[in-house]
């Protein structure tokens, strides 16, 4: 009896070991086990007839029942030699566990991969939920093991495709570094009044910049008393600077101008007299670098290097250098430079046609402090009187005389004092504040001399009118 039990025990041990080995050697993708309904471990009971006797009674094992059914059970579980040969060609229908993995060349061990590989379902088909499908995301095929941070970013992308973790949308336009420069740098000019002549001059300046294919916009500063509606209609950008003009008009009691002095100054007058000071105030946080151009200038060649040159930008650090400008170059009919200080015929000012600066709060505060008057004593009144006698250029020289640098204006910018042939001029910028081709008597005279430089200005104005009509 003992020998029989030992042989049965050995058979059980060998059979169980063989069963475990077979279950672990089976392929993961067994089509016979995809729709099991009964046993959680995948042994379908409806494919086998019930045993005639109970194999387990309580916690004791019924050895006689096991002995009687051992032969049949072995055939059922493992089959005969012929059955085993057939089983090599088709999948076994019995697996103890189904959570082993076939690790191929593309090994993936992230959390989402393991969950997708596991077959988790409830025993009852009515309670099984439909399989969860991953959203279709256009990604390249996996050839390497994904890291956990990549999985986190992928999940965040699914939750919020527009978040910072999902990258830029393919539908959104891409910006190049040049686009940022175009927005942070600009040409600036100032409209002093609403006269037809002033509007014509600004329009010709804007058209000349377009003709030379400048990559930067022209902005026109003006007060609310100046009507710049016509400029906006033709696509020129404008900016009202009343807030900064009022800063100079209304410093308050004990600081700034007295009430009697304020009444003598209008916004238009301050806009004309101190207009260049507003460059330091009105463009802070709007542009990083600006180039002021006189409103009566005509640009004949591309001058974008004034805004793009690293030498120019690096020179202005708002400490040792606050601004760059040109030195005024007056030329006569013989193309000879005229020194305005030594000219006996007429006194020419030294207002530059080009001013390059970086709007900065510290520089603006320096100008504001310069205008601040503490107390109403004689010294304060003298300072008030001095301010009303100074123009913007004089104030800038008093403040930044030792921090003012100049660009080489030889062959760059000229102010002709007489009509000269256009083909003899080799300058990028021509200033027409003396020739004034917009005045009737001057453009009539220019019509009689087609080679005159004034016809460059008049031709551009006529082209604009033809396009507008």
Swiss-Prot record:
Entry keyword annotation includes Oxidoreductase: no
Q: Where in this protein does the record put region Disordered?
A: 22-55, 67-92, 117-143
Residues annotated as carrying N-acetylmethionine in the record are 1
Residues that the record marks as modified (Phosphoserine) are: 23, 27, 39, 122, 130, 136, 147-148
Polar residues composition bias: which ranges? 25-42, 67-82
Please, what other remarks does the record include? Present with 1850 molecules/cell in log phase SD medium.
Q: What is this protein called?
A: IME2-dependent-signaling protein
Which lineage? Eukaryota, Fungi, Dikarya, Ascomycota, Saccharomycotina
């Amino acid at each position: 009896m003992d020998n029989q039990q030992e042989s049965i025990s050995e058979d059980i041990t060998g059979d169980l070991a063989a069963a475990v080995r077979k279950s672990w050697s089976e392929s993961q993708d067994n089509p016979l086990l995809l729709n099991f309904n009964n046993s959680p471990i995948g042994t379908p009971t409806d494919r086998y007839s019930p045993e005639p006797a109970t194999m387990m009674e309580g916690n004791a094992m019924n050895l006689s029942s096991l002995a009687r059914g051992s032969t049949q059970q072995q055939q059922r579980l493992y089959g005969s030699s012929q059955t085993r040969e057939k089983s090599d060609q088709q999948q076994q229908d019995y697996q103890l566990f189904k959570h082993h993995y076939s690790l191929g060349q593309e090994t993936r061990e992230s959390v989402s991969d393991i969950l997708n590989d596991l077959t988790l379902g409830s025993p009852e088909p009515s309670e099984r939920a439909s399989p969860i499908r991953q959203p279709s995301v256009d990604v390249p095929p996996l050839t390497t093991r994904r890291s956990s941070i990549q999985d986190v970013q992928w999940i965040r992308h699914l939750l919020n495709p527009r978040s910072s973790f999902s990258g830029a949308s393919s539908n959104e336009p891409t910006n190049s570094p040049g686009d940022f420069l175009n927005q942070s740098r600009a040409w600036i000019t100032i409209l002093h009044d609403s006269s037809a002549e002033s509007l014509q001059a600004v329009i010709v300046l804007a058209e000349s910049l377009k003709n030379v294919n400048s990559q930067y916009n022209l902005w026109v500063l003006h007060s609310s008393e100046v009507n710049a509606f016509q400029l906006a209609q033709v696509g020129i950008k404008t900016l009202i600077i009343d807030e900064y003009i009022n800063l100079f008009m209304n410093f308050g009691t004990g600081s700034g101008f007295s009430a009697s002095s304020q009444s003598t100054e209008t916004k238009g007058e301050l806009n004309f007299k101190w207009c260049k000071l507003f460059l330091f105030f009105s463009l802070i946080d709007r542009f990083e670098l600006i180039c002021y151009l006189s409103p009566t200038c005509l640009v004949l060649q591309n001058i974008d290097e004034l805004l793009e040159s690293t030498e120019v930008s690096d020179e202005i650090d708002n400490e040792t250098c606050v601004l760059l400008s040109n030195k005024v170059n007056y030329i006569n009919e013989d193309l000879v430079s005229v020194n305005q200080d030594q000219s006996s015929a007429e006194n020419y000012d030294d207002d530059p046609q080009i001013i390059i600066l970086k709007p900065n709060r510290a520089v603006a505060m320096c100008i504001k402090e310069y205008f601040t008057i503490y107390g109403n004593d004689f010294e304060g009144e003298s300072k008030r009187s001095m301010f009303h006698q100074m123009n913007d250029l004089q104030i800038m020289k008093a403040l930044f005389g030792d921090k003012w640098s100049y660009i080489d204006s030889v062959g760059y910018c000229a102010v002709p004092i007489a009509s000269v042939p256009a083909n003899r001029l080799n300058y990028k910028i021509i200033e027409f504040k003396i020739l004034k081709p917009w005045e009737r008597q001057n453009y009539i005279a220019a019509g009689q001399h087609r080679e005159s430089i004034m016809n460059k200005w008049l031709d551009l104005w006529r082209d604009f009118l033809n396009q507008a009509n």
